[in-house]
Amino acid sequence: FAEDGWQPPSSLQFIAVGGALVSEMLILKARSLNLPVYQGYGLSEAASVVSLNAPTNDNIHSAGSVLPHIQTKIENGQLFIKGDLFLGYLNHQPHDKDQWYATGDLVEQRQNTLFIKGRLKNLIITSMGRNISAEWPESLLLSQSGILQAVVFGEGRPFLSAIIYADTKLSNPVLAQYINVINQQLPDYARIQKWHRLAAPLSVQQGLLTTNNRPKRDAISKQYHAVFEQFYRLGEVINE
């Protein structure tokens, strides 16, 4: 709506974004439209904010400063937290408040600031031995106007490929230009070499998204197995 001329009310002072890695480009674009967007990081088990940027303490590359009631440590790239957390999961043993909780998120911490890299389970290890968080190139793809869904693959493969759903108004040549722009921001090993454009979006009904619209990567990989095999056999860009 903001791109179409809608102006936010002057009373709107702060918009917190999170739930997935948000690219710097997307935040800058939102702010250029007078949307006061600040990235944070949290999880339900922490009820729920762990770190947050603010107008007086803002690092656009990061998920902000850790809040005072949370303790953090990093082990093998994974963030562990301790503090005022949840009591536990239903029908499971209570959570020990003195025990560190493994978040499953890959994070860098510099002083008191968190830099989110992605989910541990979404780490791609290529056949060249490169470790790449899928959310890294995905967040850049999704920062481009008209790219509505993007899921990156490449586990055990020599390069990365992507499944993309884009606005029907976006032509293939323009989409290719967008991907080229994104690739210039990535090192060679993390660039999208091949991509497949979907005719219809991934959906919960197809079993390809969770109920909160996160990609079910294994299901997507199986659904488009033939596409990926053709990518790595022939190196062609395919459109449905």
Where are the language model's segments positioned?
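Conserved ATP/PPi-binding loop(s) of AMP-dependent carboxylate-activating enzymes
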Residues: P36, S65-P68, E75-W100, T113-L114, ...
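Conserved C-terminal "lid"/linker of ANL adenylate-forming enzymes
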Residues: I124, G146-V152, V181-E240
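Conserved ANL (AMP-binding/adenylate-forming) active-site segment centered on the GW(Y/F)…HTG consensus within
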Residues: S10, D58-I60, D84-Q111, K121, ...
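Ser/Thr-glycine-rich phosphate-binding loops at phosphate-binding pockets of nucleotides
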Residues: L43-A46, A102-T103, T126-S127, T210-N212
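AMP-binding/adenylate-forming catalytic core of the ANL superfamily
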Residues: G83, L106-A190, K194, P201
